[in-house]
Amino acid sequence: MARMADCAACHMGNDGTPFGGGHVIESPLGSIVAPNITPSRQFGIGNWTEAQFARAVRRGLSPDGHLYPAMPYPAYAGLSDEDIHALYVYLKWSIVPVEHGPSVETALPFPFNLRTLMVGWNALYARGKPMKHADTASGGSKRGEYLVTVTGHCGSCHTPRNILLGEDQSRQLAGASVGGWFAPNITSDPISGIGGWSEDELVIYFRTGAVVGKSHAAGGMADAIEHGLSHLDDDDLHAIARHLKNVPPIRDANTTQPAYGVASARPAPPEPVDLGVRTPDSLTDATDTDGARLYTAACAACHQANGEGTADQFYPSLYANTATGGPNPQNLVMAIVKGVRRSTHSGFASMPSFEHELTDDQIAAVSNYVLNRFGNASLSVSASDVSAIKAGGEKPLLLRLMGRLDIAAMAGALGFGGLAGGAAILRRKERIKAQFAPSPEHLPEQGEHLTPR
């Protein structure tokens, strides 16, 4: 269950300690630090009961207060009782306690540092109910749906957000920006989504992180594959692939062919590029913004001068590649800035980061060279684009409005929290009156059944 829910990818300690916390999650509102979830009584969840654990995982309410939805509890609300129990037992009794907390703490700007605002947000966007174990267990009729929408929480990254940063269910899995990267459309649409992928290709991608002629995982997807998907068995991987192949298609009106097929025609071999006299510091020369020279110096040794990559595709082709042929340049820029690191049972893949070797102008220049020669030539990148992508991409509308309205917007946000929280209380009273639901102060223990009160 910990693998399926991808707990390790976010809760990994900065020193690589499993579940020790400290990993920084870049959210639209700022940096959120994942906590220690080992059985340490002082720093982790060692003092939590199973009911408290279930409440935190499903409702985002821990013994210490409200969690932020960087912890995907709106998706985990669907976890079955049996899987909650299995996850609790594993984390409580099978993990070595880490006796220290993260070195930094979450510190979001006002008013988002007021966690009580989550009462209103949760009333709108965290209303899921546990699924039945009989349907979601291996071989169950809803196994694929469960792995995609609940344990895998794919929508947390791949579904666009609305103005209040809740998932826009009308565009489920249609693609969204996450921390500078772009989590692509994974609906069944053959042009904008994964409809052109076979089930077997999807399984290979989940297992290895790479499908030649399609895509190579980087960023958060590489983490999800390394720590989670690559450890699932074939039955579960096929269940995920089958479900995604049946997700209603959503077409992006601006795309006319799949991202991996944008530049299928190979141009003539490039002319030799005169690099002049090169020194170890030459890449940091901010005056050199010639894309061809930068590509030859920084990229061609691995991806080859013609962009074809190596024969075994250990260093991938820049043609038929979603990073270069996608609807926007975010993943190309982020791969250059952050590099790539991915380790699975099939091997290790890496690309160095050029964040400190190239200026924003140079990253833009080499990105444009790659796009024009090997990828989606309709795109272009400026230095300001690179700077914005490095900073996490375009700010959500809510933050942009707050920047303009300042105090009024802050007051509105606080008012929203109060109104939505009041609405939640009214709905809770109605549920209690109907005598079929528990109060927020009580969550059934494993095996306990709710009865009318």
Q: What function would you assign to each model-found segment?
A:
Residues 12, 18-23, 65-68, 98-105, ...:
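Short, solvent-exposed loop/turn and secondary-structure capping segments
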Residues 1, 12, 17-44, 55-56, ...:
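Sequence context of c-type cytochrome heme-c attachment sites
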Residues 32, 56, 60-64, 82-138, ...:
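Post-cleavage N-terminal segment of exported redox proteins
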Residues 3-12, 35-36, 51-58, 73, ...:
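C-type cytochrome heme c attachment motif
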Residues 31-47, 58-82, 103-107, 183-194, ...:
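Axial heme c-ligation environment in periplasmic c-type cytochrome domains
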Residues 384-409:
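Short, aromatic-rich amphipathic segments at membrane interfaces
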Residues 1-13, 18-25, 118-122, 132-162, ...:
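Sequence/structural segment immediately N-terminal to covalent heme-attachment motifs in c-type
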Residues 20-26, 160-209:
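Active-site substrate-binding loop specific to GH73 endo-beta-N-acetylglucosaminidase modules
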